[in-house]
Every structure is written in C-alpha cells, then in structure tokens.
Amino acid sequence: MEHKKIAFIGAGNMVRAIVSGLVANGYPAQNITATAPSEARRLPLEQDFGIRTTSDNIQAATEADVVVLSVKPQMMADVCKPLQAIDFTNKLVISIAAGINCSRLDDMLATKLNLVRVMPNTPSQLGLGMSGLFAPIHVTEHDKAFAAELMEAVGKVCWVEQESGINNVIAAAGSAPAYFFLFMEAMQAEAIAQGFDKESARLLVQQAALGAASMVVSNPETELSTLRENVTSKGGTTAEALRTFNEHQLSDIVAKAMQAAVARAEEMEKLF
C-alpha cells in the first residue's frame, strides 16, 4: 500500500478502527493526521497510535494527499464550508458519512472531487468489518485501489457499480449487525424462559452464532442452504424449529426489513 499522507476529518470510533488497522499493518503513523475540536477526542489517538492530531481541519486537509471525511451527516455542510478554499485537484477524498451522495459532496466542497463513498459497519472496530464502496466514473483505478486498501485495514470490501447500490450495502451489511443482535436477543430471552441464567443463555447463543458464522467463512464454496440442510435431520428438532420459522414467514420479514432500510436510506439522502 502506498504511504500517502492521510487526513481524517473527524476522530470517532470508525476513524480509530481504521487508524488502528493501518498502523498495525505497518502504515507510517507520521503520515496520518486526525482532526477534532475536542482534545479529549484527539489525545487518545495520538497516545495510542503515534499519529498527528489537530483541531485545524484546513491545515490537515491542505497537507494531505487523501482526505477522509468522517463526521456526522448533519455536520458535514458546516465542516466542508471552510474547506472550499482548498485545491482538491490532486487529492483523493473518501467519505464515510451515510446519507450524503457524491453530487452533494461536490456541492459542499464547491468542486468536482476525486471521490470514493464508503459504507462501513460497526464490526470494523474489531477488524471484521464489511464496507461497500462506490466511485464515480472519473475516479482513477489507482485512487480506487487506495480506498479499497484503506478499508481492508478493518475488514472486507465490496464495490458497487451504481451509487444507489450503497443503500443496498446498508441493508445487507451496514445495518445487518443489528439484525443478528436482535435475533440473538430473542434466543437469549427464550433460553432464560426455559431455565438458563442470563450468562449461560448468552454463552449458548453467542457461541452458536460464532460457530455458524465461522462455518460459513470456512466453507466458501458451500451454499448457505446446504449448510442449513446439513444440520437438519428429517423429523428432528431442527426441522421443527425451521418449520415454525417458515410458518411465520421469516424470509418475508427479513426481505421487508431490508427493503425498509433501503427506503430509509433514500429518504435520508434527501435530508442533506
């Protein structure tokens, strides 16, 4: 990975995860800057990873080859306005803010950007993230490769060909950890109802989930349906549980939930 100068505008949990992954993989800490108005936000990054931090967004972005916008969507316009004075011609801009499309970011920074939009998810904080990426047609393969390598510091990446695909990434991966948490919550609650204490119920559920996910990852050529069928004996307990799920249309519920996530993402784009 080319060791460009990176400026993270923002210093939240996702920035911390990316910086941690980069430094752990040998990226020079002196080439990384993170900005935040609060010293309480900046200091831990400086102390833990040896990177530079500052409250001066303009200086950090001016000196950088790559500018990563990592602020809340509702704050983006205010953060970008002072940055309009910067010449972004030879810079790569990466946005990890939800709900703000490429055209809107061009408007916010008053220029046509070399821009990659990224939609990560929270397991990135453990290096197990899944990020969707989109780049307009004028962005070079070189810049796209750098953006992908940046996000591979915290997990896997998937490119989408149309910007609308970012909203589909939100439904399939960005919001997905919460789906699994909800399912696990329901299982834990029923295990408690059946007599387990809270800690034992959680252990049973989390280890089953970890094992199932690990089996998926360890068998990339095996269809998910085949893995399910391999656990299901005709007339057995698993078959009866799955029959109950199907009777209550679990697949339809999942589809409707993912469609609702996409619809909400589309609505959010109109807000900013």
From Swiss-Prot:
Gene3D superfamilies: NAD(P)-binding Rossmann-like Domain (3.40.50.720), ProC C-terminal domain-like (1.10.3730.10). Keywords: Amino-acid biosynthesis, Cytoplasm, NADP, Oxidoreductase, Proline biosynthesis. SUPFAM superfamilies: 6-phosphogluconate dehydrogenase C-terminal domain-like, NAD(P)-binding Rossmann-fold domains. It comes from Vibrio alginolyticus. It catalyses: L-proline + NADP(+) = (S)-1-pyrroline-5-carboxylate + NADPH + 2 H(+); L-proline + NAD(+) = (S)-1-pyrroline-5-carboxylate + NADH + 2 H(+). This is Pyrroline-5-carboxylate reductase. GO terms for biological process: L-proline biosynthetic process. It comes from the Bacteria.
